[in-house]
Amino acid sequence: ALIEWLPAHNNTPDETRIVHGDYAPHNVMFHPTEPRVQAVLDWEISTLGNPIGDLTYNTMNWYGPATSTGRPNFSGVDLDSLGIPSFDDYIAKYCERTGRDGIENIHFYKAYNLFRLAAILQGIVGRVRDGTANDPNAAQNAARVIPLAQRAWEEAQLAEKG
């Protein structure tokens, strides 16, 4: 399934940049009164990679399963009233700022990141089982793994359709 599908369908452009690896709202410090970022935190898993991976990880609030990413989900939220752009507007702004015409095969990247997060959480579940987990709430990650993997497969199917 998905573990075989991802490498077989990785026809993404080879584009190497510095990537954060965990670029998401919980690792960004915003200015208290202005709409701008003051700092990006938590760089310990930064590496060289495809920046669209960071982008689609950052946007998981828009497309991830409602209760499984461990972060807020925008499903059913009036984003406009909160000043939060839609997924499409966010991607369009990214493309505008980076000089892109669009994102090729965005569903592949979304499937990859959902699968990646499911694998990370499964690793935490293993640490709970082995008694080596640091976080007292780590066991709750077990319930998140399957919905993430299922959502990843849905994105893989969308990637297949083009």
Please state what every model-predicted region is:
Residues A1-G21, H31-E34, A92-G99:
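An alpha-helical support segment within catalytic cores of ATP-dependent transferases
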Residues H26-M29:
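Catalytic-loop signature of eukaryotic-like protein kinases
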Residues V37-A39, S86-G102, P147-L148, A152:
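Short amphipathic alpha-helical segments and their helix-coil junctions
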Residues V40-S46:
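Activation of the activation-loop gatekeeper triad in protein kinase-fold domains
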Residues G53-T98, Y112-D130:
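Active-site activation/catalytic loop segments of kinase-like enzymes and analogous catalytic loops
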Residues D101-N113:
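All-alpha amphipathic helical-bundle segments outside canonical DNA-binding/catalytic cores
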Residues A119-G162:
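Regulatory N- and C-terminal appendages and interdomain linkers associated
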